[in-house]
Regions:
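General structural signal for secondary-structure boundaries
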Residues: 45, 53, 69, 122-123
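Aromatic-lined carbohydrate-binding surfaces of glycoside hydrolases
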Residues: 4-25, 46, 64-80, 153-155
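Structural recognition of the beta-strand scaffold that forms the well-ordered cores
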Residues: 2-6, 59-62, 104-108, 145-148, ...
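Non-catalytic scaffold segments within catalytic domains of secreted glycoside hydrolases
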Residues: 28, 70-99, 115-225, 232-256
Length: 256
């Protein structure tokens, strides 16, 4: 593994990054409604970056566009990447991190097309807030690269119209479109499992075509890149999901 996204997945859409910095004994315990658990916030931004340095992985950071927005994203970027002399850069320094992290890649939300997502949005709603958020973030740090949310899965009812509308609204500020895809295991046999690679190829081909259409529409010289930042074999039975909250904190944080 060379790259890890933080805070990852559905968790981020209700996450307040300020809860995960500073003295651990003062960090609040919060309900994590995405995964129906208690989040202790004992592992936050600075702990993640210490881990990333030790393991030599490249970080991708994600901002909350589910319950928060432009201002919060700007503050988080300032905390991580601005040198000193401002409220949030000096907050980072007060937490024992003198030098800015210089986080290069940032995701603008996570799977905002999904009805399961806290703060779920239409393509139009998401496209607008992502474009404005990206614009402000690049005013703070012009060297960052931004990843906008594509369809959560190629099986979504709104695919690929979602991707087209989001790119239409964000093409000028976005550098990558996120692709997420999970496949079932071998319940239907090895041949069926392996054949799913054909579906993935078709998924990528379709999204490339969508991006080319928007590029031509915008008369842009920029080629949109793609970030496959969630993928794997889905092994969690659907009947395990319920509305009960586990009052015991996760032993492994769902933020990773």
């Amino acid at each position: 593994v060379t790259t890890v996204r933080y805070p990852g997945g559905n968790f981020v859409s209700a996450y307040h990054w300020e809860d995960g910095v500073g003295a651990k004994e003062k960090r609040p315990h919060k309900l994590d409604l995405a995964w129906r658990s208690i989040e202790t916030n004992e592992f936050g931004t600075n702990e993640f970056m210490k881990w990333a340095k030790k393991t030599n992985v490249n970080p991708i950071f994600t901002v909350n566009l589910g319950t928060r927005g432009v201002e919060d994203a700007a503050h988080y970027l300032e905390y991580c990447n601005f040198s000193s002399g401002t409220q949030y850069s000096d907050m980072r320094k007060s937490h024992g991190v003198d030098e800015p992290y210089g986080i290069k890649m940032w995701c603008l939300g996570n799977e905002m097309d999904g009805s399961w997502q806290i703060g779920h949005k239409s393509a139009e709603e998401y496209g607008k807030i992502a474009a404005e958020t990206g614009k402000v973030m690049k005013l703070i740090d012009p060297d960052i690269e931004l990843i906008v949310c594509g369809s959560s899965l190629s099986s979504m009812d709104t695919y690929p119209e979602w991707d087209m509308e989001v790119l239409d609204k964000t093409y000028d500020v976005a550098d990558y479109l996120a692709l997420h895809q999970y496949y079932a295991g071998q319940e239907k046999g090895t041949k069926t499992f392996l054949a799913q690679s054909v579906d993935m190829e078709e998924y990528i081909h379709t999204i490339r075509s969508v991006a080319q259409v928007i590029k031509q529409k915008k008369r842009s010289k920029k080629d949109m890149k793609f970030s496959v930042d969630e993928w794997g074999v889905w092994a969690v039975p659907s009947n395990t999901v319920n509305n009960e909250i586990d009052e015991k904190p996760w032993q492994i944080a769902p933020a990773i």
